[in-house]
Amino acid sequence: MQEIKNMRLISHHDLNGFGNIGEGIHLHQTNDGKRILYMAHESAPKDITGIDVSDLRNPKMLVQTDLAYPHLRSNSLSIIDDIMLVAYQSLEPGQAGTGMGIFDIGNPEEPKRIGFLDTTGPYSRGCHCLWWVDGPYAHLSTGSADFQPRDQKDDQFYMIVDVENPERPVEAGRWWVPGTREGDDEPMPKRHPQFDSGHRLHNA
């Protein structure tokens, strides 16, 4: 039997029973020196959870929010200064509420949504994953209202979003695998006969 080596558990928080954390985890230091661990949830009903881990032996929940729809998930987030970006993806194409939310977390106990990039569309499941580490640009794997894939499995592409003004995010660029979009001149890429999970972007 394997044993834990050179590590020990010093504390635990059950997140009020909602432990379905996805890819979105970010340790944020506030201006007054507190360390807040923000986490995004893989499925409804919860959206984001913030835990004060300044005292590692005594983690305390500061905030836990609810998703707007039961078909959404918020499995990715990124933070710079007091601005947090959250990805919203739906279970099925065409469902409401998908895109990228922008929050002011200056008050860690009351995240305030100040902006939103809507990527809802008939073939879109919204934003799956985002990456934002510096500068004005966020990098998304997402669908959109104006992107129709030839195969529904190819519904996510690479989008660059200008978030310099967090209240008004604007698309700055995009790329997709040539041949996967309706209207492309290129032929559709070959599909794997057994393991075809799509020619779509997972992480940006």
Task: Identify the function of each model-found stretch.
Residues 1-204:
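Feature marking well-ordered beta-strand scaffolds used for ligand recognition
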